[in-house]
Amino acid sequence: FSYRNYLSQKVFPNLDKDILDINNNYKPDLILLGHNNILQKNTLIELKKKGTKISLWYEDHVANYGPNWRNNLSLIEKNNDLIDTYFITTHPDVIRTKINKNKLNFLPIPVDKNIETLSIYKHKHRYKDLFFALSHGVNFGGLRQNTRDERENFLNNLVKLGKNINFHVLGINNDKPKWNYDLYKEMMICKMSLNLSRGKPLKYASSNRIASYVGNGILTFIDEKTKFHDFFSKNEMLFYKNEKDLAEQINNIKNDINRINKISANGKKRYFEIFNNLIISDSIIHKTLGSTQKYKY
């Protein structure tokens, strides 16, 4: 169940009591807190009495220059003496926190063959050059009002520089974000995509759109300051310095469909080789429980 049931719909009025009851029934080795940290301290103490490990994964910004980063960091720092491991979508080296650094681990956004099912590079009718979908949170129904989003400045500059580029940008000019298959349909008419997250580009930091793009086989551009070139070569992903450099790279490749398709296919293959859901799950279990790892990472 989702913790949001407790906070909004109040389907289960006694969250901590229910968690303790479930724990007594199943006696788990590991409890994984998914993008939340709302259990009371006494509840965590009780859960750990029989050796249960507690881990937390978190996707939002917890380093400077990202939206709401202070609140996000405060949230995960709560009860950090009782949480055994953390998995965050930014390299731990760039985070200043009271959490013991040995507990912090980088969490790549995983792909799943049952979700990232497309091979967009195989589609014949892709008449748009570059795809980008702007949103203010996963599955948030619309764009938040009165929210300053620096990505719009980046996109406006890019459009001005790319007069000969056929853009397909969703989520601006009051256009509501699209999700799931509706999003996939929009991606399938495009040759390339832009992975642009809110905030300052930081080492290994990315929103979960990167899995949707690369995992579905569409050539993806990402800021070189994220250092994703540690994982991907220029035959699997393309890296830009700024808006001008990005516009030049797009113009240089947009008519070379064979090269676009090759990079797209290579990127999808590589992403599934190193960041699929089985590997990421195994790394969480191994790093938290000390179990034998099944994969190299």
Task: Show the residue positions of the predicted features.
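N-terminal pre-catalytic "stem/leader" segment of glycosyltransferase-like enzymes
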Residues: F1-H61, T85, I280-Y297
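Nucleotide-sugar donor-binding catalytic core of glycosyltransferases
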Residues: F1-R4, K10-D18, Y26, G34-H35, ...
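A charged, aromatic-enriched C-terminal amphipathic alpha-helix characteristic of glycosyltransferases
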Residues: K254-T288
